[in-house]
């Protein structure tokens, strides 16, 4: 019989590295192996525990309450604040929207006002819960415009959203003005600090200029903050914090309408593994406030160094002014951003391409963590080489006939055969019979084709791609 752990390690060889500070999306590396060891041991110790019933596993309840308490101190939360440990930022956002909707049962057509830069999880919440997402354009600095946000609010608005920071550009919205406008109309204001909530408080302590964004701002009613990002905890935890218990009440669920146990949940999940909770608690206990200050200092030092590298390279510029640890770069017409992405990836630096949106050109996203600091000189060299290679390769051009064909398509009317043809033409094949992912070695042409498609067509193509990826692999008889 084969060793499953040996096969597991072989499978993992195809994944992006989670350590080494070179994967600048999806993972957040502290650069400290001891933090990883503590997390692994805590997760393993609680892998079989179930946070479904806090009276059955009171240790998990204690850990959750202590995590929320640590976050409350970071977020300037009042003594009345309460919080919930969720499975990730998307669930925190889903619950914030669900709670806002259900707190206003008299509103039959609920709406929420979002900056165009708000995280896509709010669109998911709108889809799940039947809340209309009212998108408001941002200014040239990529921050929400408070006056335009205020004008979009009406009697059916149940939630107003601001980002701290926005994922795509790394800037903090003017929370003070937005929250004041929401409060004046009696509307909840949620600050999405999923990616900034555990690092921005230390930015202020380090003397960096950060717009006000915490519960210290009057009118902010709830905040989401992910612990698996800049708390450097294991994947699978986030926090949703409310200013007071009354604001959380609509989020809680109970059902005694069946013959089994009375279901009682504070999240969308019932069964919740104790592993991520214990892993997160152990990491936060180990690092502590002073440790997080040191890690934040390293992350911001890496940000400053990377920004300097980008600004030094002809043809590159930083998009917006980073308030946090997210850096967005764009290119001029002398080189193609998608080719530049491929070149960086080929040199061991995973960066995330962002497609054009509205008037904004394609860009490249970097989530910088403390573990990146030790490698910034390597990044500088890789960036210089990648820029030269991308410039020499020239732009990736999508045939005009293909562009016209894509623009004429209605994604709602396409059949599975149509999608198969489009996916094959784009290079997004999917998975083979043995479940292996099949993608081209370089993604520039794929991204260029997606870039000329409308957002609706991108969504349809990528959902078709995901459907073809997730197909069962059967064992031979």
Enumerate the language-model features and the residues they cover:
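Non-catalytic terminal extensions of PLP-dependent enzymes
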Residues: 1-61, 65-69, 330-477
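Active-site nucleophile and cofactor-binding loops and adjacent substrate-binding regions
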Residues: 56-60, 83-90, 114-116, 320, ...
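Predominant activation on well-ordered alpha-helical scaffold segments within soluble catalytic domains
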Residues: 64-72, 94-101, 123, 176-179, ...
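A short linear hydrophobic-aromatic micro-motif
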Residues: 81, 314-317, 350-355
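A generic structural signal for well-ordered alpha-helical segments
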Residues: 126, 182, 310-311, 344
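Active-site C-terminal subdomain of aminotransferase-like
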Residues: 205, 209-325, 329-334, 477
């Amino acid at each position: 019989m084969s060793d499953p752990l040996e096969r597991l390690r072989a499978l993992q060889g195809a994944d992006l590295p989670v350590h080494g500070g070179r994967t600048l999306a999806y993972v957040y590396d502290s650069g400290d192996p001891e933090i990883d060891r503590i997390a692994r041991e805590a997760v393993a110790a609680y892998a079989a525990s179930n946070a479904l019933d806090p009276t059955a596993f009171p240790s998990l309840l204690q850990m959750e309450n202590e995590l929320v308490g640590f976050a409350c101190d970071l977020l300037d939360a009042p003594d009345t604040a309460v919080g919930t440990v969720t499975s990730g930022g998307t669930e925190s956002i889903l619950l914030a929207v669900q709670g806002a909707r259900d707190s206003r049962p008299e509103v039959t057509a609920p709406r929420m006002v979002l900056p165009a830069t708000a995280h896509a999880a709010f669109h998911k919440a709108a889809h799940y819960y039947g809340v209309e997402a009212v998108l408001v354009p941002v200014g040239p600095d990529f921050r929400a415009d408070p006056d335009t946000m205020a004008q979009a609010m009406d009697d059916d608005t149940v939630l107003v959203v601001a980002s701290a920071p926005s994922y795509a550009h790394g800037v903090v919205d003017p929370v003070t003005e937005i929250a004041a406008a929401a409060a004046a109309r009696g509307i909840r204001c949620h600050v999405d600090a999923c990616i900034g909530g555990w690092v921005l408080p230390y930015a202020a302590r380090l003397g960096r200029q950060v717009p006000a964004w915490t519960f210290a701002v009057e009118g902010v009613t709830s905040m989401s903050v992910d612990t698996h990002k800049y708390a450097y905890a294991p994947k699978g935890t986030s926090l949703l914090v409310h200013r007071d218990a009354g604001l959380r009440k609509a989020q809680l669920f109970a059902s005694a309408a069946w013959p089994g146990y009375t279901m009682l949940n504070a999240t969308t999940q019932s069964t919740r593994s104790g592993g991520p909770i214990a892993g997160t608690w152990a990491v936060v206990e180990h690092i502590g406030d002073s440790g997080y200050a040191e890690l934040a200092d390293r992350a911001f030092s890496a940000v400053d160094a990377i920004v300097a590298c980008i600004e030094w390279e002809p043809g590159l510029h930083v998009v917006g002014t980073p308030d946090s640890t997210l850096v967005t770069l764009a290119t001029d017409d002398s080189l193609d951003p998608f080719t530049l992405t491929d070149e960086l990836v080929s040199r061991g630096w995973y960066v995330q391409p962002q497609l054009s949106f509205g008037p904004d050109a394609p860009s490249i996203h970097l989530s910088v963590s403390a573990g990146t600091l030790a490698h910034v000189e390597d990044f500088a060299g890789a960036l210089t080489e990648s820029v030269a290679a991308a410039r020499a390769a020239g732009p990736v051009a999508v045939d005009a006939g293909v562009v016209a064909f894509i623009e004429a398509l209605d994604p709602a009317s396409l059949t599975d055969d149509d999608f198969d043809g489009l996916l094959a033409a784009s290079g997004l094949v999917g998975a083979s019979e043995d479940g292996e992912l099949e993608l081209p070695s370089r993604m520039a042409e794929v991204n260029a084709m997606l870039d000329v498609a409308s957002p609706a067509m991108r969504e349809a193509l990528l959902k078709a791609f995901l459907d073809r990826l997730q197909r069962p692999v059967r064992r031979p008889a």
